[in-house]
Amino acid sequence: EQTADLKVNHIFKYTSIKEIFNEITGKSAEVLKGMVEKRQETQVILCYSGCGGVGKTTVAMGISAALTKNYKRVLYMNASHLQVFQQMLINHSPITTMDVYSRLANPGGNIYDDIKHVIRKEVFNYLPPFKASLLSLGLNYSVYKEIICSAKKSGDYDFIVVDTDVTFDEAKTELIGVADRVIVVTKQSMASVVATNILVSNINGVSKEKFV
């Protein structure tokens, strides 16, 4: 089966990060490669999937690394209710400054400026993990949208790569709306294809050209 209404790029599980980036930019020149060559403002790339375990975080970090190595200013941000992405980085430690969480609980239009001092860099810049789930911290999922929009407005980055979880709700549709491109990651299994088709069938009113 094929995923409905999407341009499908086949990427094997053990494909290198460089090959993944070249595959995406090569087959979707008008989508990502064009964005790299002709940037007018900060571009938001959202990595999404219909189910877990498909390698979405690997793809998101791979794109972040590849763009950085191509001399682009990149911010990687994990937008999950419970974050576990840090296991793929050298520094696993979460944000511990209570002032940051206080500001995230009541984000203003310049929330990025309020928290950018905690941003770290390994291969690429990234927002460190929160010390607990959004629920435990009393944070609304919409805080991610606020950070993205504020960081975009700052002009500090060429690309903001957002790695989101599989939850589909109103807040997630708002993230999709903010994104310039949405990469839907799947794998060659019946369960993954079915989940992707269900996801796509529930996304209405969004231009197909936004999706990779």
Question: Which role fits each region the language model picked out?
Answer:
Residues I11, I45, L75-M77, N125-L127, ...:
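Hydrophobic/aromatic beta-strand patches that form the interior of the parallel beta-sheet core
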Residues D5-V8, Y71, Y157, A179-D180:
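Short, well-ordered alpha-helix to beta-strand connector turns
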Residues S154-G155, F159, T164-V212:
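Conserved catalytic-core segment of NTP-binding enzymes
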Residues E41-H81:
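Walker A/P-loop phosphate-binding motif and the immediately C-terminal alpha-helix
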Residues N70-Y126:
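Phosphate-binding loop that captures ATP/GTP phosphates
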Residues E1-V44, S93-I95, S102-Y112, V194, ...:
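Acidic-aromatic/histidine active-site loop/patch
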Residues E1-Q2, Y14, Y48-G50, A79, ...:
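Structural motif
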